[in-house]
Amino acid sequence: MILKLFVLGLYFSILLGIGYFASRKVSNISDYYVGGKKLGFWIAALSARSTGESGWLLIGVTGMGALLGVSAFWIVIGEVLGVWISWQFMAKKFKRMTDEYDSITIPDYLVSHFGSTTNLLRIVSATALSLFVIIYVSAQIDITGKTFESFLGLNYYTGIGLGFGIVILYIFSGGFLAVAWSDFFQGSLMFVGLLLLPVVAFFTISGSESVISGLNEIDPGLLNPWGAGGLTLMNLMSVLGLLSIGIGFMGSPQVYV
């Protein structure tokens, strides 16, 4: 328990330190909201992906893999395709257009591009973004509480307050720069952890044959790429649904401005 608390304290200290140093780089509203649009390649990449994945990937998809087996990989394929399309065909073009209007947010761009003279377009677009972002952030807050509960045995709501409080502190102090730099730090940890976990599991379980035979004993359907029951209409519809997760990544506001 002492080691866990030490690691957690070190982790939070790094996040608060990032917020402090980011605050020293903020000199105008563009710096605060979009980092002056001058993030480096790796920071932008890891920030976007750690925002897009985070608890959804580390907790949600891994749990889904445990329940569905090999067929859960369809959601990974859909995500990779969606992310690739958004970066390859949409993000660069959209950023060029927002730079032309000197837009900081997507509502700013829409108002400038369509020459809106009222606040209706801004209100509608901001409301839509706020609604879906709040839903997504709520899921991350829920994951934070559950992680503290299982990791340290803390009360669920105490974990939410602690984790969310740290996030609010470094966001208020350093704005988007603090978010991007902290995402880079946390994304690097996620990347290394996801690379090491299967390697450690492979050698701990004594090879791939043991994994396959173990899954087969639990449920042969876990090894079927179409899911339990094979290629049926229901499973085909499920696969199409899992692949369609990539559509959501084409509308990620943090990627485009």
Listing of model-derived features with the role each one plays in the protein:
Residues 31-36, 49, 63-64, 91-99, ...:
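Helix-loop junctions at the membrane interface of multi-pass solute transporters
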Residues 18, 22-25, 87, 91, ...:
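Hydrophobic alpha-helical segments and their helix-loop junctions in multi-pass secondary transporters
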Residues 74-171, 240-248:
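Helix-loop-helix module between adjacent transmembrane segments
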Residues 1-59, 171-174, 196-199:
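Membrane-interface "cap" regions at the ends of multi-pass membrane proteins
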Residues 2-23, 35, 39, 64-104, ...:
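Extracellular loop-to-transmembrane helix junctions
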Residues 34-39, 43, 60-77, 111, ...:
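Loop-to-helix junctions at membrane interfaces in multi-pass transport proteins
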Residues 2-4, 62-76, 141-157, 177-186:
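Transmembrane helix-loop boundary segments of multi-pass membrane transporters
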Residues 102-107, 111-116, 175-185, 251-257:
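Hydrophobic, small-residue-rich membrane helices and short re-entrant helix-turn-helix hairpins
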